[in-house]
């Protein structure tokens, strides 16, 4: 009765001897911070529409990489534009 330490057939590549590199997620940078960053304005409908989904909902900052402070400004500008009928509340 001898024990063998051979890797099993269903073992991951790291156990077989080949080390796998960890997945590297690139850090997202806020598009509204920096020298040439656009100003958030409720009248700039073209800019605001990039941060509204096709159903009319505000896209979360984890998807758009907008900082928390700028996300609050963006949400306020979108809501103001909706109130003034520059943007629709819902899209059919």
From Swiss-Prot:
Give the molecular function GO annotations.
small ribosomal subunit rRNA binding; structural constituent of ribosome
Query: Which Gene Ontology CC terms are recorded?
Result: cytosolic small ribosomal subunit
GO BP of this protein: translation
Superkingdom field: Bacteria
Q: Which UniProt keywords apply?
A: Ribonucleoprotein, Ribosomal protein, RNA-binding, rRNA-binding
InterPro entries (UniProt xref) = Ribosomal_bS18, Ribosomal_bS18_CS, Ribosomal_bS18_sf
PANTHER family in the record: 30S RIBOSOMAL PROTEIN S18 (PTHR13479), SMALL RIBOSOMAL SUBUNIT PROTEIN BS18M (PTHR13479:SF40)
Stated family: Belongs to the bacterial ribosomal protein bS18 family.
Q: What does this protein do?
A: Binds as a heterodimer with protein bS6 to the central domain of the 16S rRNA, where it helps stabilize the platform of the 30S subunit.
What NCBIfam families does this protein's entry cite? Answer: S18 (TIGR00165)
Query: Self-association or partners: how does it assemble?
Result: Part of the 30S ribosomal subunit. Forms a tight heterodimer with protein bS6.
The name this protein carries in UniProt is Small ribosomal subunit protein bS18
Please tell me the species this chain comes from. Answer: Caulobacter vibrioides (strain NA1000 / CB15N)
What phylogenetic lineage does the species belong to? Bacteria, Pseudomonadati, Pseudomonadota, Alphaproteobacteria, Caulobacterales
As recorded in Swiss-Prot or TrEMBL, the protein's gene is named: rpsR
């Amino acid at each position: 009765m001898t024990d063998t330490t051979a890797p099993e057939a269903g073992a991951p590549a790291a156990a077989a001897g080949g080390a796998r590199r960890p997945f590297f997620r690139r850090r997202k940078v806020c598009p509204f911070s920096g020298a040439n960053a656009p100003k958030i304005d409720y009248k700039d409908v073209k800019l605001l529409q990039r941060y509204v989904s096709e159903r009319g909902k505000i896209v979360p900052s984890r998807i758009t990489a907008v900082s928390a402070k700028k996300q609050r400004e963006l949400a306020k500008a979108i809501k103001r534009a909706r109130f003034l009928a520059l943007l629709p509340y819902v899209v059919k």
